[in-house]
Amino acid sequence: LRTDFGVQSDLNPLAEAWVLSCHPDGPSYLPDGTMLADYLAAHPEAAGTDCKKFEMFPVLTKFIDAKNSISIQVHPSNEYALEHEHQYGKTEMWYVLDCEPGAFLYYGFDHEISREELEERIRNNTLTEVLNAVPVKKGDCFFIPSGTLHAICKGVVVAEVQQNSNVTYRVYDYGRVGADGKPRALHVKQALEVMRRTPPEQHDFSPHLAKCDYFTVDVVAGGYTGTADETSFVSLLITEGEGRLTCGGETVQAKKGDSFFITAAAVPML
């Protein structure tokens, strides 16, 4: 992330970069040092009228670089998360930016499984035998509704667009230990309560890459002209190359790894 996407961070290893966030665990800042969340609290019209139906800013965007496989995990629905965690649940999508040869990820189950078998496989560390292991290539997209068991595996880099939430229930972590030398906490009880035990559904969001109540994602290449009307902001994430962004008479340079927040009702951008 540092070398290819220009991420500046003291974290080591650097596995994630939150590039559009109003979440307190990793807030985004404007160039003048103002937190994006504070700016939107003072200027709610900048987020757009569609955001008024949400108690909190609805979206969080990040880069993820899985140098090692991420824990097998699940995210709860809004209903469960608001009741038990006091924040939103998490529906998300992944867009594969790069991957090593032979890379794959886990995406739900390869067949329907009973709760009893699932509990047994978690206990005896055979969970991966029934997961849907999907080979990946650059440009692949995966839509992951809340309740879907999933994991990004070693050698995959993705852009993730998700609900504004940081609730994760881990069910398997490959026996790894944390910095304190102890196994990282699992959340099996909660995971069993929210998990879908069936194969993932197929989704076709054409002409969009992904679309749900919380976000719409498109991929554009080369020149692009668009507008942000009063209904919603536009977030631009540069995943390849470099160029120029013009909006409101101002032109700025844009390069791989940059993230731009275009306020609702902004003038055309190029």
Q: Each predicted region: which residue ranges?
A:
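Short, basic/aromatic beta-hairpin or loop at an interaction surface
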Residues: 111-124, 230-240
